[in-house]
C-alpha cells in the first residue's frame, strides 16, 4: 500500500503550479512511506544454559505472557481510537516520467482539496484535545486496489475510515473490509446508500430522496388551510425520480392538505385556485418543459386573482433564468446540500487560514473535508470510537458547508437527511 502520514507543504506561485507542487510533494512522501523499513522491538537472545523445571515458575511466566498480550491488545485498541485512515483518489500512479502535468493536477484536484480541508479540521481539534494520527492512502480510483486496501494492517489499526469517494471504490472496499463494525465515512458520493448494502456506511451527501423529503417538509410547512398543492409531473428522468414519493411525504408531514397531481399544463391551469395560494411542485430539469412551465405560471401569476408559489429540483441552482424576467415573482424555492454562508466570520476565517496555508482559496471539497474532520473528530473526543454508532443519530451538526442529521437503516447504514433551502432573489438562488 502506498500511504503517507500527516504532512503538509506550503504552496507558492500560480494556482496550477501550487497544486503541481503539492502533488509532487505528496507523491514523494507516498514513495518514501511505501519504501520505509518497518521498525520492531529488539529482544535479548535466550540463554540455553538456564532451564527451569518449576511448575510455579512456568505458570508465572504464562500469566505474565498473557498479561503482556492483553496489555498489548489494549494499547493497540487505545491507539486506534486516534487513528484515522483517509482514502482519496490522488491517482499518483498515473504521473509519468516527465513529472507532474496539468492533467495530473486536474485529476488529483478533488482529492487534494478535500485532504487540505480535512487537515485544517484536525488542526482545529488539536487546539483543544490530543491530536489524531492521520494515514492518507491513494485509493487510485481502482476497485481491485480498494479491495486489497480493506484487508491491510493500516485499515485494521484505524478507528474510522474516511473514504473512498467513488461508488465503485466504496462497493469494493466495503465488501472486503473484515471488520463490519468499523465505520466507513462516504464523504462525497451522492449515490443512494441502498446501492451499497453496507450497514456500517455513513453517507454524508444527501441523496435525491433526502431532497424530496426535505422539499416535502417545506411545502407542508408553507401550506395553510385554503391553499392547494399541485404536483406537476413530466416525463424526464429527473422529474420522475425527484417526485417519486413526494405526495406521500407531504402528507406524512401534514395530513389535512388538499393535494393533486397533474401531467399537463392544461390540467394544471384547470386546477389553479383563485382563493388560496397555489403551491406548485415540479421536478423537471428538461429545459423545454421548464421554460414552458415558468412562462405559463408567470402569466397566470400576473392575473390578480392568482397567487402562485413554485418549488423545484435542486439542480435548478445551476440554471440561468435571466430570460424569465418575472421568475422571482413565483417565489421559487429549492433544496440544497450547501449551507455555506460566505459572509459569516467563521467562513471568512477558514477561507483566510486556508489561503495562508496553501496559497489558494478553498473549494467546496475543502469545506466538506473540514466539516467531516471536525464532526467525527469531535464525536470521537466526546464518546470514543466504540460509541460512535449509538450516538450518530443523536448528534446533529451545522458546519461550514454541510448540515448533518443522520437516520439509520439496518440494511444500508447511516444517511444524512439534512438539507437547506434557497429562494430565488436578485437573479440567483440564495440561502434563506
Predicted regions and their residues:
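Extracytosolic ligand-binding ectodomains
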Residues: 2-31, 35-432
Amino acid at each position: 500500500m502506498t500511504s503517507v502520514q500527516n504532512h503538509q507543504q506550503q504552496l507558492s506561485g500560480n494556482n496550477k503550479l501550487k497544486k503541481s507542487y503539492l502533488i509532487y510533494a505528496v507523491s514523494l512522501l507516498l514513495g518514501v512511506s511505501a519504501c520505509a523499513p518497518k521498525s520492531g522491538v529488539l529482544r535479548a537472545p535466550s540463554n540455553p544454559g538456564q532451564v527451569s523445571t518449576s511448575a510455579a515458575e512456568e505458570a508465572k511466566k504464562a500469566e505474565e505472557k498473557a498479561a503482556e498480550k492483553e496489555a498489548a491488545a489494549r494499547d493497540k485498541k487505545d491507539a486506534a481510537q486516534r487513528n484515522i485512515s483517509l482514502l482519496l483518489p490522488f491517482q499518483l500512479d498515473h504521473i509519468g516520467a516527465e513529472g507532474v502535468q496539468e492533467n495530473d493536477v486536474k485529476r488529483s484536484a478533488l482529492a487534494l482539496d478535500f485532504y487540505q480541508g480535512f487537515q485544517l479540521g484536525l488542526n482545529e481539534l488539536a487546539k483543544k484535545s490530543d491530536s489524531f494520527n492521520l494515514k492518507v492512502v491513494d485509493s487510485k480510483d481502482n476497485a481491485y486496489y480498494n479491495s486489497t486496501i480493506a484487508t491491510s494492517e493500516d485499515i485494521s489499526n484505524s478507528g474510522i475510515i474516511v473514504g473512498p469517494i467513488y461508488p465503485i471504490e466504496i462497493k469494493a472496499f466495503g465488501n472486503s473490509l473484515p471488520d463490519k463494525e468499523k465505520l466507513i465515512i462516504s464523504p462525497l458520493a451522492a449515490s443512494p446508500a441502498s446501492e451499497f448494502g453496507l450497514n456500517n456506511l455513513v453517507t454524508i451527501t444527501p441523496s435525491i430522496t433526502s431532497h424530496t423529503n426535505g422539499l416535502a417538509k417545506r411545502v407542508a410547512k408553507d401550506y395553510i388551510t385554503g391553499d392547494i398543492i399541485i404536483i406537476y409531473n413530466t416525463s424526464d428522468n429527473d422529474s420522475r425520480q425527484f417526485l417519486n414519493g413526494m405526495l406521500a411525504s407531504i402528507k406524512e408531514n401534514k395530513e389535512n392538505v388538499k393535494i393533486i397531481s397533474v401531467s399537463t399544463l392544461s390540467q394544471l391551469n384547470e386546477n389553479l385556485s383563485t382563493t388560496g395560494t397555489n403551491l406548485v411542485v415540479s421536478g423537471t430539469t428538461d429545459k423545454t418543459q421548464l421554460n414552458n412551465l415558468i412562462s405559463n405560471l408567470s402569466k397566470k401569476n400576473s392575473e390578480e386573482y392568482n397567487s402562485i408559489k413554485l418549488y423545484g429540483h435542486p439542480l435548478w441552482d445551476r440554471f440561468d433564468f435571466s430570460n424569465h424576467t418575472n421568475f422571482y415573482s413565483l417565489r421559487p424555492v429549492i433544496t440544497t446540500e450547501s449551507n455555506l454562508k460566505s459572509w459569516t466570520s467563521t467562513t471568512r476565517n477558514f477561507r483566510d487560514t486556508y489561503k495562508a496555508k496553501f496559497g489558494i482559496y478553498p473549494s467546496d471539497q475543502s469545506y466538506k473535508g473540514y466539516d467531516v474532520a471536525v464532526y467525527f473528530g469531535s464525536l470521537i473526543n466526546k464518546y470514543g470510537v466504540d460509541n460512535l454508532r449509538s450516538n450518530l443519530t443523536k448528534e446533529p451538526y451545522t458546519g461550514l458547508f454541510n448540515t448533518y442529521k443522520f437516520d439509520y437503516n439496518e440494511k444500508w447504514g447511516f444517511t444524512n437527511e439534512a438539507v437547506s433551502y434557497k429562494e430565488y432573489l436578485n437573479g440567483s438562488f440564495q440561502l434563506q
